[in-house]
Design a protein with these regions (language model features):
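Conserved NTP-donor binding/palm subdomain of two-metal-ion nucleotidyltransferases/polymerases, i.e.
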Residues: 167-265, 269-385
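Short N-terminal targeting/anchoring amphipathic segment
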Residues: 45-64, 77-79, 308
Length: 385
């Protein structure tokens, strides 16, 4: 692990400086550690070192805030320690008007944008939580002020905390190879065919080339998208040498916007779309059971898309229903047009083609790849952490 600490200045005899010096000295037992101050070329060093974690130690400082925001924009994992700077007495009594202006200009935004905060006691954590700017705040005591923890223990706990941050944002580290592996595994896990040639050789080679770190990210993603049992089944069918990782034991922060865990309702259209329900009822025959079910599932998928909670599991359920049932494809398209979700449905078919390898003979109508599809991807499948 490569760690980059930033503090405005290091001064001999200063409590914060002594804390940073002790922390970084002990962390070198576990990682590559470098410290920068305001006089260093922060951006140049960060781009050269490519750290896994950037830890900012500052509050109410414009330069530190700008550097933190730059690091966030560049995709680095950024941790912020304000060292009591957000406490009520400091905000309200010390240059109150100036701090309010700084809050509006940059401080609140910085706290909100970083991956997480690290504080040194529970009181500081509660005061920071009260502001509502950041929910991901953990406590690791300062060994200089708390005799119950040694310097080495403090360093070890911060390394574990950094790993927690990195495991929370694992999607940022996922490569196209890992994403392709997920899609291949879904295709195999959902297949009802008994053929041994479910995947072309290049996709099989991709799966057999994955290392343990890549498998770890794939399985974390499978948990978050509620497709773990499908992935596990595919691993078994393909007899892949995947590591046995119990992802439930991996420490992570809660997702900002977790996916909907419930399956797509197949009986009724949920939510506040009475006109959609009415249009379905007006244009469906009683004997068109499968057409009705698919239309309902697509309507419910449309609602989840708007809530940004559409998951890979929902796509998998649609894939199974569309591929492994007999129905009148022209009637399905007609009903979806009356329901006014036909274009959305075509985009979903495109997702099934791209992500689950839905073959041409099983597509009920032509898929649609447009800006609307990009919007669905952005709302539901782009770096959710």
């Amino acid at each position: 692990m490569r760690i980059l600490h930033y503090i405005n200045s290091l001064k001999v005899g200063n409590l914060l400086s002594d804390y940073i010096l002790q922390l970084t000295s002990e962390q070198k037992e576990y990682a590559e550690v470098k410290s920068l101050t305001s006089t260093d070329d922060f951006q140049k060093v960060a781009e050269k070192e490519n750290p896994d974690i950037i830890h900012i130690h500052a509050c109410w400082d414009y330069l530190a805030a700008k550097r933190a925001q730059w690091a966030v924009k560049k995709g680095y994992a950024v941790v912020l320690s304000t060292h009591w700077g957000l406490n009520e007495p400091i905000r309200s009594n010390e240059q109150r008007i100036r701090k309010f202006i700084k809050q509006m200009m940059y401080q609140q935004k910085t706290v909100h944008q970083v991956d997480a905060m690290l504080v040194t006691n529970e009181k500081e954590r509660q005061m920071a939580l009260t502001l509502g700017w950041q929910k991901r705040i953990d406590v690791i005591p300062n060994s200089l002020l708390n005799s119950s923890i040694s310097a080495s223990e403090m360093a070890e706990q911060t390394i574990l905390y950094y790993n927690k941050v990195l495991d929370t944002r694992y999607q940022v580290a996922m490569s196209s190879m890992e994403n392709d592996a997920v899609y291949s595994l879904l295709h195999v896990g959902l297949a009802r065919e008994t053929s041994h040639n479910l995947l072309p050789s290049d996709q099989l080679l991709n799966l057999r080339s994955l290392n343990p770190a890549q498998w770890r990210r794939i399985l974390l993603y499978s948990d978050d998208e509620n497709i773990r049992e499908i992935i596990d089944d595919a691993i078994s069918r393909l007899q892949l040498n995947a590591p046995n990782i119990e992802t439930s034991t991996i420490q992570r922060f809660a997702l900002v916007l977790p996916k909907e865990r419930n399956p797509l309702n197949q009986k009724k259209i949920v939510g506040t779309k009475p006109l959609t329900r009415q249009r379905l009822n007006d244009n469906i025959n009683s004997d068109e059971t499968i057409v009705r079910t698919i239309a309902i599932m697509l309507a419910n998928a449309h609602q989840l898309d708007r809530k940004q909670t559409l998951s890979m599991r929902h796509l998998a359920d649609l894939y199974t229903m569309i591929k492994y049932n007999d129905y009148d494809e022209d009637r399905l398209a007609e009903v979806l047009r009356h329901m006014r979700i036909y274009r959305f449905s075509r985009r979903i078919i495109q997702l099934l083609v791209d992500k689950l390898h839905l073959e041409e003979g099983f597509r009920p109508f032509s898929p649609l790849a447009d800006n609307g599809l990009k919007a669905i991807m952005k709302r539901n499948f782009k770096h959710r952490y």
